[in-house]
Design a protein with these regions (language model features):
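The beta1-alpha1 cofactor-binding region of Rossmann-like NAD(H)/NADP(H)-dependent oxidoreductases
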Residues: 54, 58, 74-86, 118, ...
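Conserved Rossmann-fold SDR core element
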Residues: 70, 97-99, 176-179, 185-202, ...
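C-terminal helical subdomain
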Residues: 213-216, 223-318, 495-571
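Substrate-binding pocket helix/loop in short-chain dehydrogenase/reductase
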Residues: 112-113, 117-122, 408-424
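Canonical Rossmann dinucleotide-binding motif of NAD(H)/NADP(H)-dependent dehydrogenases/reductases
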Residues: 6-39, 331-365
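Active-site helix of classical SDR
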Residues: 136, 171, 466-470
């Protein structure tokens, strides 16, 4: 593909996926007002993606042209990699370049932590994660050749706040994780950022009404009416999609070229950078006299309060000066920990390490037999149920399933390796979801409180995104199922053989010790030298400007916040 690197000599070309309605349409129209040629990509399906939508009397492209701009529609789907690639290369052939892609495409299906069938979960993950990866794989080579380009993805507060949004929440956390990683290694002259919007879109209203219908079926008519009224008020309080147009156009333009790898929340009248997870606590695990004793001491005194406050309680008098050299005292048996734990893994080394650590805390280790761990919802439920019957009941599940690891070949640039390492991520996320949901459902049905832990290989970029999706899933489990289950997520960021024993001890603590619920929903991490606790993503500061147009001072103010944050993270 012949790319014209001198964009100043031609009209800017911007693609907006999901540009047929809602926020995508608003951004497309705002971009067109800057003089760019806009291509709106929308397959014209209903919000759940299951059927053709009623064709509008006037498309977004029609409105742009009627207003004096230049645009055309495309009915390609982001899930069709061939179609996306053909669209982008065709635009380069026609115009000489592709200057920006703003990826707003998405669908919504009724899913929650414990709701939604496998098809619904698969469809949502496919559009939001695989679809965005298709866009990136097609756009980045073009922009790399040109030496310039802007990519703006879309995540959601449901992906970084505690939310019972099911597949949508996991997908948007994966998009956030991908943005934070890819943006830092983007090709020279190319930026990758994401918008985290809130608006009364058809996707939001559909999701809220689906939740109302699911809850209302279990209530009296009056209660259902009250719920409906509350949802109407919630929707009425949200900004309209049109309010987000100028913000999206700005974030996807050269004016924002100073930023890459950042997520900006906006409601059309405010901007707030969303910080990635940051380390709150770390505890040494090498050359210690008794690792289990270190965990028993440090986690309840440091990790649990840090998770609750999202801040360390350190930086004062020494908390654990001698604990790393102390031998373990005679342990009192746990009274509220699990007694029987199902270990789900396709790696015999994990099985051995986990079972040894569990046994040291008096927890019986249960396997799934000779069969490979299931990955589909029905198969997982069947395997868990059979294991529970064979063992006479279980009250913990640990999932340390590698599956097919998406490592990098080592060839190509850093951004190419990031994309390569995300191959198969939606299948991995769906498998994790299947086991965590099945464990929670079993707890609810059996009346036995359950502890559920996921152990994720986070040594690759795709593994890090999977680990963050698992952390978001554990937050949803804590939010929805805390009455009968605690959920823990551990990202393993080392390939060293020592990881088996050290992470095994950490899992042993979470499953077998008394009262570990204070870390339910937390994001735990293990390296070769230490185990740690990370913060949840959060907005660092907010700029209020009234909207929807951005005053001239907003750019410099936002730049100051983001740059201060970046300097702080490097310090």
């Amino acid at each position: 593909v012949a790319v014209d690197s001198n964009a100043a000599d031609r009209q800017q070309v911007v693609v907006v996926t999901g540009g047929g309605a809602g926020i995508g349409a608003a951004i497309a129209e705002a971009v067109a007002r800057t003089g760019a040629y806009v291509v709106t990509v929308d397959p014209g399906v209903t919000v759940d993606g299951l059927a053709r939508d009623v064709a509008p009397a006037e498309t977004t492209a029609d409105r742009i042209v009627a207003a004096g701009g230049a645009a055309r529609p495309s009915n390609a789907s982001v899930t069709d990699a061939t179609a996306v690639d053909a669209l982008f290369t065709g635009l380069v052939d026609e115009f000489g370049g592709l200057d920006a892609v703003i990826n707003v495409a998405g669908i919504s299906r009724p899913t929650g932590f414990d709701q939604g069938d496998e098809d619904a979960w698969t469809s949502v993950l496919s559009v939001h994660v695989d679809g965005y990866l298709n866009v990136l794989r097609s756009a980045l080579p073009i922009m790399t050749a040109a030496g310039r380009g802007r990519i703006l993805g879309v995540t959601s507060g449901s992906g970084w706040r505690p939310a019972n949004a099911g597949a949508y929440s996991c997908a948007k956390r994966a998009v956030a994780a991908l943005t934070w990683q890819l943006g830092k290694v983007a090709p020279a002259g190319v930026t990758v950022n994401a918008l985290s919007p809130i608006a009364a879109t058809r996707m939001v209203t559909s999701g809220l009404r689906s939740q109302n219908q699911a809850g209302g079926s279990q209530n009296q008519a009056g209660g259902s009416q009250n719920q409906a009224g509350g949802i109407s008020l919630a929707i009425a309080a949200m900004p309209s999609p049109e309010q987000l147009g100028p913000v999206g156009a700005y974030l996807g333009s050269d004016a924002f070229s100073w930023s890459s790898g950042n997520i900006i929340f906006s409601n059309g009248s405010e901007l707030a950078p969303v910080l990635p997870p940051r380390l709150l606590e770390a505890a040494r695990i090498t050359d210690v006299a008794a690792l289990a004793h270190v965990l028993d001491t440090v986690i309840p005194a440091a990790f649990v309060p840090a998770e609750a406050a999202q801040a360390t309680n350190g930086a004062s008098n020494s908390r654990f000066a001698g604990v790393f050299d102390e031998t373990a005292p005679t342990a009192e048996p746990a009274t509220s920990g699990a007694r029987s734990c199902l270990v789900v893994t396709d790696d015999p080394r994990w099985e051995s390490a986990l079972c040894n650590a569990l046994a040291s805390r008096g927890v019986k280790c249960v396997g799934i037999g000779a069969a490979a761990p299931a990955t589909d919802f029905a198969g997982v439920s069947a395997q868990l149920g059979q294991a529970a019957r064979d063992a006479g009941g279980i009250d913990a599940v640990v999932v340390a399933r590698a599956g097919t690891r998406s490592g990098s070949s080592g060839a190509g640039e850093a951004w190419e390796q990031v994309l390569e390492e995300h191959a198969g991520i939606t299948d991995a996320i769906r498998s994790d979801v299947a086991w965590v949901r099945a464990g929670s459902a079993h707890a609810g049905a059996s009346g036995r409180r359950m502890r559920i832990a996921t152990v994720t290989d986070a040594t690759t970029s795709g593994g890090k995104s999977r680990a963050q999706a698992a952390a978001q899933l554990s937050r949803a489990a804590h939010l929805v199922a805390e009455v009968h289950a605690d959920a823990f997520a551990i990202g393993v960021e080392t390939d060293a053989d020592s990881r088996y024993s050290t992470v095994g001890e950490l899992v042993g603590y979470l499953v077998g010790a008394d009262d570990t619920g204070g870390l339910s929903g937390a994001e735990l991490v293990a390296t070769t030298e230490w185990i740690g606790l990370r913060s949840h993503p959060y907005p660092e500061a907010s700029i209020s400007f009234g909207g929807p147009e951005l005053p001239s001072w907003v750019d410099a103010t936002l730049r100051g916040i983001v740059n201060d944050s970046s300097e702080s993270s490097r310090a």
